[in-house]
């Protein structure tokens, strides 16, 4: 066992050769490297699989022995300063390593087909492998300096991946927005690290916690300064995990390829903030105000993310706001001191959200056969609907992921979310009411996304391809109200390419992508419908290839069974609570005397309540959306609900207010744009003016005046020495007279 721990340092470095070799290959042997590009995908999966096996081995040893292993090397040694590098293997490290590697492998396999059309295929896999290296380095770090180094590497990789299609202006703006927003949090993190080093004199976690606890117990620190440093540390987690108020970058991050969204939202970038708070929880616990602040930020994010997801048309943006809300649940649990519940929900949410994103990618991939490469069309749920019979495997997988996120048993997120909801009653009834209400909102918007995407009719076919007036049938509303107004104001259905109707796609179509031809023939940076290998043009979407469906099906298994890891089956001497063994010793401020057993009566009572709330949200979604999509024969029923009356007008005002709030992102982006972005630009323009006209103007003006004076003097002189002597004595006499009169 000791030998296994000694070689754990290779965990973050195993995926690193792939991006290095790809870079060297493209530099020195570009043609050969591109022609063998699938070999690099295989190597990426292989190396990450080795890391996964190594991580599983470490986790088994963690479960059996509950040991913590740390190894350090002295890097800088001075009289009063020393800096060590090393790695730390504990339950948190092993959990995060398995999470990163399993989700990462599924995303890499999926990406081989999803990105096969793109000429940036090799660059994509290089970024992905470097992303995995950065995140694995972050979770194995043994001190705050290493945390910060890998924290910045994670940010850089995410910046490159969000802006992967950098020639699209919207993608370039999205990665800039993510970069700038995270700079705010990262600067706070750096200041917090320096502040705690000034207090304790150490960057190492083991020394930092011990010294700080001693200082607190002896009342030898300034609590105001300590709280400020803790808030600055937490600011890094707020930005990275898209917590309010630094959440604005997350929806725009959907401009990257869909596999990137799956990895960022499931196991890497946004999970980094949760990991940081979990790692530093022993530090935060002894500062009561910071724990309250963490829980407050968490509950605000929970509710805000859910409300902003209510009216999204873009399927990926809807999932992004869902991620924001679920991360809020994790942050709330950490703020309450419920360490186990937070990590449990991190695990279950990662697999469920990866499943949903890969499922949405499969839907987008199939929709592109109809609308071409245009994210505003292929990701628009208004143009979807009726996909059940065309993509049945994707539909079933997405449905299971939806039910999991809604908290329906026995799927994964039910078990973890229920723990957080139950613990919230012990912490604060107000927070509990908000958290439980948001569970209903989660069920509503997730079910809404499912219905808009898969149920009813394929809405894109309600267009008149001849260019004549559209059909008189009702338009489909994203929000569930009369569609004509909304459709005209917020979106317009697209005019499609002419499609043949004699072709149908099989559910498992065996399409072979010719890599060499793709590399040479792709002259545009983005996917175009003409570059699909299919010789037939489909008038309906078709199911994705096996290489895309395989990771989705594996994630379905995780979604079905990973929740059982955390069920505390500790009855009658049978101890099957694997997660509690894994996390021993665990921190739980709400159940200090708990032995992790469960009162099944209380559990069932709470479960019935939570499932009832989720079921109510699902029912409302079906009530608003299902009748519209079921059949045109229900028009009389629909019309009965749209009769104008006082109650209807009042209801519409409320509904429109909620819609405007959600569709406009809570006006937070507009506020930042008006008061921060515009203000900063005006300040920059003023600084530019002051620098050029005042700072540079003074020395330039002096130089210019000297030049003109010299020119005047030069023109006066005629080259005669007698003239020079005359002017010299004249100036001397003038200055002597001035001195004489002013002196006396």
UniProtKB/Swiss-Prot annotation:
The Gene Ontology biological process annotation of the record reads: ATP synthesis coupled electron transport; electron transport coupled proton transport
Judging by the UniProt lineage, the source's domain of life is: Eukaryota
Subcellular localization, as worded in the UniProt entry = Plastid, Chloroplast thylakoid membrane
- Choose one Gene Ontology CC annotation of this protein and give it: chloroplast thylakoid membrane
Which molecular-function annotation in GO is an example for this chain? NADH dehydrogenase (ubiquinone) activity
Q: Which UniProt keywords apply?
A: Chloroplast, Membrane, NAD, NADP, Plastid, Plastoquinone, Quinone, Thylakoid, Translocase, Transmembrane, Transmembrane helix, Transport
Membrane topology listed for this record: Multi-pass membrane protein
The chemistry this enzyme catalyses reads: a plastoquinone + NADH + (n+1) H(+)(in) = a plastoquinol + NAD(+) + n H(+)(out); a plastoquinone + NADPH + (n+1) H(+)(in) = a plastoquinol + NADP(+) + n H(+)(out)
Q: Does the keyword Translocase apply?
A: yes
Q: What is its EC number?
A: 7.1.1.-
Thylakoid recorded as keyword: yes
Q: Which Gene3D superfamilies match?
A: 1.20.5.2700
Looking at the UniProt entry, the stretches that span the membrane are 9-29, 40-60, 89-109, 125-145, 147-167, 185-205, 219-239, 258-278, 290-312, 327-347, 354-374, 396-416, 425-445, 549-569, 608-628, 724-744
Q: Entry's Pfam families?
A: Proton_antipo_C, Proton_antipo_M, Proton_antipo_N
- Stored InterPro entries: NADH_UbQ_OxRdtase_chlpt_su5_C, NADHpl_OxRdtase_5_subgr, ND/Mrp_TM, NU5C-like, Proton_antipo_N
> What the protein does?
NDH shuttles electrons from NAD(P)H:plastoquinone, via FMN and iron-sulfur (Fe-S) centers, to quinones in the photosynthetic chain and possibly in a chloroplast respiratory chain. The immediate electron acceptor for the enzyme in this species is believed to be plastoquinone. Couples the redox reaction to proton translocation, and thus conserves the redox energy in a proton gradient.
PANTHER family in the cross-refs: NADH-UBIQUINONE OXIDOREDUCTASE CHAIN 5
Q: How does it assemble?
A: NDH is composed of at least 16 different subunits, 5 of which are encoded in the nucleus.
Tell me its family: Belongs to the complex I subunit 5 family.
Name of the protein in its database record = NAD(P)H-quinone oxidoreductase subunit 5, chloroplastic
